[in-house]
Amino acid sequence: MIKKLTLCLSFLAFPTIAHKPGDTSEYLYGLGFSTNKEIYKGYNRRNILLPIIGYRGEKLNVFGPFVSYKVSEISDFSFLVQVAPRFQGFDDSDSTIFEGMKERKFSMDVGASINFKKNDWKISISSMFDVLNRSNGTELVTAISHTFSFGPVFVEPRLTFSYLDSNHVDYYYGVNKDEVNAIRPEYSGKSARNTGFGLSLSTPIFFGGFTQLSIQRTWFSEGITDSPLVEDHGNITARLMYTRNF
């Protein structure tokens, strides 16, 4: 169940990447494809083909359940408030490692970010909090990127550092006393500091729209990888998206 829900909506987590540079207000539609391998044991690769609908304005951005609003802008800095669902979790049908465990549910996060943009450099610091009291967790993310232009092709490497508190890690990667079995010892999650590096290629030259290919590698710290539910120390996600204006 959790796997199916995530497949339907995971593309919407990227509302700001599929637009032409210089556009200030637009309704978008298009298609996207994503593939990635979860780090949970026995949790298979996800392949997603998904329609995309969204709106990008000077202050308001809406992509399905993902919403951000620019509260203020001073020089090269902007301050945003944002709402986003967190499609993490599992139930016992997603993998044999989860059999006999309680469902870990998706949640909604609310938070804010400070963004700096100058000379094709972008730096953002964001903080998101679980408001449905599923994990009562917090995530802090710092991202640094730079856009290089090669004619109509834009290349953007991106480095991210994220912090997940112990509440978040314990909920999604921990094993409670009443969930212990022969292959699944008790585990209390610890806070985790993860690192990611991604690269995206974007261009407006195809079919009158905007195309983007992005690949990201994420390395997870011991607070997550020490869990008996986890088999990998990192994963790679690849996405291909095409959008155009209504």
Give residue spans per PLM region.
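Surface-exposed strand-loop-strand hairpins of Gram-negative outer-membrane beta-barrel proteins
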Residues: 37-49, 93-106, 190, 223-228
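Short glycine/proline- and aromatic-enriched beta-strand/turn motifs that initiate or cap beta-hairpins
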Residues: 19-67
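Residues that define the transmembrane beta-barrel architecture of outer-membrane proteins
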Residues: 25, 45-51, 75, 104-110, ...
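Outer-membrane beta-barrel transmembrane domain signature
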Residues: 68-69, 131-224, 229-231, 244-246
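Transmembrane beta-strands of outer-membrane beta-barrel pores
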Residues: 33-39, 57-59, 83-89, 118-120, ...
